[in-house]
Amino acid sequence: VAVGEKTPEGAVDVACIVSKPVEGVNAGKIENIELVSRAIREAVSEAEEQLGIRITEAYAGISGDFVRCARHMDHVFVYDPQNGVNQKDVDALFDRMRNVQAPDDETIMDRVPQNYVVDDNQEVKNPVGSFGKKLSSTFNFILCLKTPMQRLDMALKRVGIKMLSVTSNAIATAEAVLLPDEKEEGVAVVDI
């Protein structure tokens, strides 16, 4: 359990980290909800005692072979090509990606644009202001089987914690340790 506070700049100041041994998890999958809930309860209680606060909500991380990535490409036609791509065109593309459905047994945890292409030939980081008739993008979808996520949510609810959202531990680790230019250059984080 890590407890932090968001700074005005959007960073997170970590106030405390509490780790407890846990049984009932195999390859990232919760197999015994009682054992997992007990370990969460112990860690949360210790963090609450250290900080003098009550924890009722949490952002959770999840990892295992049931988390995967899939790419999806789509496009929109630029609303006003004479004036170039604007934020409404980018938003329209995001809306199309939000309508992409996961298989029945999975849920989409995140949708991350990998690149933008204007008129099938000009790749750009930020398409706003570019000229063209068609805006395309390849998005990386982070997918997770529903059952492991539901069990994690259930374990947190058993100790009175509402799960605000869940993210892939791999994504969370990269966000925590890599600078924006390192991510742009393709630096890899290896968590052993």
Q: What would you call each of these model-derived segments?
A:
Residues A2-A58, I62-V190:
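Nucleotide/phosphate-binding catalytic cleft detector across ATP-hydrolyzing
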